[in-house]
Amino acid sequence: MQEKAGFRYQWKSEGVDVPLMHEKRTGHVSSMTKDQWQWDRLYAAAKAVQNGRKISEYVEAGGVAAAILAVSGRIYTGVCVDTCSTLGICAERNAIFNMITNGEQDIQKVLAIMPNGKTGAPCGACRELMVQLMPESYQHIEIMLDYKTERIMTLGELTPEWWI
């Protein structure tokens, strides 16, 4: 671990300096829960693939990055691909399709990092895909709304009445 601005950072092996969420508030890494450790891993994974760039005059990619924790414990990442038509894809759906490509379909946690570096909620299309993917249990998927303040909601709270 490294010291920077009073916080320890891990994930250096992945090329990303990520402040440990729990240590920012308590000053202690040893008291970090499994849940906090998972969110830190998701943040580091998303940050590692975030690389906003122009691919062509019609396509930009990587401004938003997402990481999904599958129920198995594996993490899947994706980046947004924006096009000048409707052919683009959000980072969250890209990560979900990566998960499906690798034989999994059950989501536990979702974290997306926006171009400004903050985390935020998935858009309606991404929420809809998660609901359709897990119609019996989507309500329990955890979404990191604000990594800095540790604000987390479930997809059920964000999408309380699907297809009334």
Where do the model's predicted regions map?
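Short beta-strand scaffold segments in enzyme catalytic cores
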Residues: E60-A70
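Extreme N-terminal basic, low-complexity initiation segments
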Residues: Q2-F7
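Hydrophobic "anchor" residues
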Residues: R74-I75
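C-terminal binding/interaction regions
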Residues: Y9-W11, G15-I55, E104-I164
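Active-site segments that bind and position negatively charged phosphate/pyrophosphate groups
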Residues: Y58-E60, V81
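Short amphipathic alpha-helical face segments that pack within enzyme cores
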Residues: C90, N94, A125-E128
